Structure formats: structure tokens, C-alpha cells
Regions:
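Short, compositionally biased low-complexity segments
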Residues: 20-23, 71-81
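Active-site loop segments of alpha/beta catalytic cores
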Residues: 1-39, 90-328
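Glycine/serine-rich loop-strand microenvironments at binding/catalytic pocket rims
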Residues: 57, 74-77, 258
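Active-site gating loops and adjacent loop-to-helix segments of metal-dependent hydrolytic enzymes
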Residues: 78-91
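Catalytic cores of transferase enzymes with a strong primary signal for eukaryotic protein kinases
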Residues: 66, 82, 315
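Short, glycine/charge-rich beta-strand/loop segments that flank catalytic centers
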Residues: 61-71, 121-126
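Catalytic domains of carbohydrate-active enzymes, especially glycoside hydrolases
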Residues: 41-63, 170-171
Length: 328
């Protein structure tokens, strides 16, 4: 099987020769710098895939901010306090992505040949208003500025549909993620009622178009997503990543409760400095879920710089072994 056939078969819960081997989140700069000192011959992401024997993929993030969008005063602070501010920054939002879409031509051809999957990211309906309001003001806005929240998300949904229409003329990615980060170690950052009122209507506008294009929709949300998974299904979302182990996520529990759920990630990055025995034990923990289909084991977030080059070589060697074993 080629890379695209294998990924699609896995996500359809069909038999395959082996599971995909991907690093869904590119490595930290500090990690690459360490590995270069330890003998890594390249810092190029795609050459690193080949060097480590990982399956290639290509990701394109279609962000809704133009290059002219003003920088916030500090991390976590936003540029929008109310409707007037939104009107001021709106001319710097929702740019066309003509150049990025044109750049997909070679990726689309490589995907057609089965050489790697194409993945796109769109900003989600929790994530995007947070970038405008700032972290604290965003959480108050659900109660204090509901009309503005709805306007932002309707504008965003309209924008996503325009981007998808233009992109589909060039490339139809294998899967996509909505960047959200709407959960933390204790669960969701919003209630089911808030999700239903402020996010669900806009997912229901965009997700059916993804289905028409045969693009598998995932949510990218850190922390413990477990309680949210049924909410996601209600709006047509099919998968979740990265399923952070340190936040308390358990893929076995999720699989038992949600046999339909596609999952990427969940390999506990904290074991990667503890030697081969600990890394193998983590794969043994995941193996029963790997055998159920619909699950790509991958580091549950970017590989941290505490992991040596030899540690990572050990990890990818075990990944190769267990991706064969899971398909037996």
C-alpha cells in the first residue's frame, strides 16, 4: 500500500499492511538544535522524515489574519475589546490565500501518486475569537458580548467556505484539523450549552462541505478532551488529536465509548527520556487500541528537547515495530 491508501484504510477501519508512521507535530527548534549537535545531518523537516523513516505529509494552515494585522500588546492579550475594535481590525482579517493555494499543486500531485497525505488546518470557532479578544476577555465575551461572538464566528465560517471552494480547485486534502485548544487538564474550557450556542451552528455550516470534498475533519485540542467527544460527533467531526496522556486522556476508554472515533497522537512524550524499556511499555499500552483501527500513534505533542537523538532513534525503531505488529 502507498501512504495515502494506508492512511485512508486506517481511518475507514479497514485492513492494511501496517499503520502510518507520522510525527504529527513538527519538532521544537530547540530539539532540532540539540540533535544537530548530536549528529543529525539536516534540519529540513521533509529530509528529517526520510532520515527517521517516517511517512511524509504536507500541512498548510489557512489563517484568517492578513500580514497587516496588528500585533497584540502581549502574549494572551487581544486587540478587540468590543464591536468598534472589531470593525477597526476587520479590514486586516479574512485575506485571500491565492499564493498558498497555488503552492498546493505539487503536493496535490504527490498525494495523487500516493507519496504522502495533504493536511490543512483552519482556525476553529473557539480559537479564533480568543486570538482577537485575548484569553480572559474571550471567556467573559460568551456572556458579555454574545452578538459579537456570533458575528466573528459567522464571518469565520463564511471565510472558511470561501477558502475551501478555492482550494478544492487545486487540491482535496486527505484530512484537516480545526485548531481549537478548548480543553485543559480538567476538561473543556466551556460548557455544553456554550458549545451548542456559539460553536455548533458554525461547525454545522462548514463540516458538511468538508464531507462533500471527502476531507476527514479532526479537532486539534490540547488537554483532556474526553467529555467533549460526544459534542464533536453531534456536529459531524470525526477525529481528535493529540490526546495528551499527561492531561488524563485514555485512548482505551475513548475507544470503548466511541468506536467511531479517529485518533492521532497519545504516545506519552514524557517516557521518551527513560530508555527503551519505558518506551516499549508505552507502545504495549497503546497496542490494543492500535489494533482496533482508526488510530495513528504519535508523540502526544512536539518532541521536547530533553529527548536525545539516540532516544528518538529508539522511539522510531519501536514505532516501526509496533506499526507492523498492530496490523497483524
Amino acid at each position: 500500500m502507498n501512504h495515502v491508501e494506508r492512511f485512508r484504510a486506517l481511518m475507514a477501519f479497514w485492513p492494511m499492511d501496517r499503520l502510518p508512521r507520522i510525527e504529527w507535530a513538527a519538532w521544537w527548534d530547540n530539539t532540532i538544535e540539540r540533535w544537530r549537535r548530536e549528529g543529525l545531518p539536516t534540519a529540513d523537516r521533509y529530509e528529517m522524515y526520510r532520515y527517521f523513516g517516517l511517512d511524509p505529509y504536507w500541512q498548510c494552515w489557512f489563517g484568517p489574519r492578513a500580514a497587516t494585522f496588528p500585533s497584540p500588546p502581549a502574549h494572551g492579550r487581544g486587540m478587540v475589546a468590543g464591536a468598534d475594535d472589531y470593525e477597526k481590525v476587520r479590514p486586516h482579517l479574512y485575506p485571500p490565500h491565492d499564493a498558498a493555494i497555488e503552492s498546493l499543486h505539487p503536493w496535490a500531485e504527490a498525494q495523487r501518486r500516493g507519496e504522502g497525505v495533504v493536511w490543512i488546518t483552519l482556525e476553529g470557532f473557539f480559537w479564533f475569537p480568543r486570538t482577537l479578544f485575548g484569553i480572559e476577555r474571550h471567556l467573559y465575551a460568551f456572556y458579555d458580548q454574545p452578538e459579537l461572538m456570533h458575528r466573528m464566528n459567522q464571518d469565520l465560517a463564511d471565510y472558511h467556505l470561501r477558502v475551501l471552494e478555492a482550494m478544492a480547485k487545486v487540491c482535496r486534502p486527505t484530512f484537516m484539523t480545526f485548531a481549537e485548544d478548548m480543553s485543559y487538564n480538567n476538561g473543556p474550557m466551556l460548557s455544553k450549552a456554550m458549545f451548542d450556542e456559539f460553536l455548533a451552528p458554525y461547525y454545522r455550516q462548514v463540516v458538511p462541505h468538508l464531507a462533500e470534498l471527502d476531507i476527514l475533519p479532526f479537532i486539534d485540542t490540547d488537554g483532556n478532551v474526553t467529555a467533549m467527544v460526544p459534542w464533536l460527533r453531534e456536529v459531524g467531526l470525526k477525529g481528535v488529536l493529540p490526546l495528551e496522556r499527561q492531561a488524563g486522556v485514555d485512548a482505551k476508554t475513548l475507544r470503548e465509548a466511541c468506536p467511531w472515533l479517529r485518533m492521532i497522537g497519545h504516545y506519552d512524550k514524557m517516557v521518551m527520556t527513560r530508555g527503551e524499556e519505558a518506551m516499549r511499555a508505552e507502545f504495549e499500552r497503546l497496542l490494543p487500541v492500535m489494533r482496533t483501527g482508526g488510530f495513528v500513534p504519535s508523540v502526544d505533542h512536539q518532541t521536547p528537547p530533553g529527548v536525545s537523538l539516540q532516544d528518538y532513534r529508539t522511539y522510531v525503531g519501536l514505532l516501526a515495530e509496533y506499526t507492523w505488529r498492530a496490523a497483524d
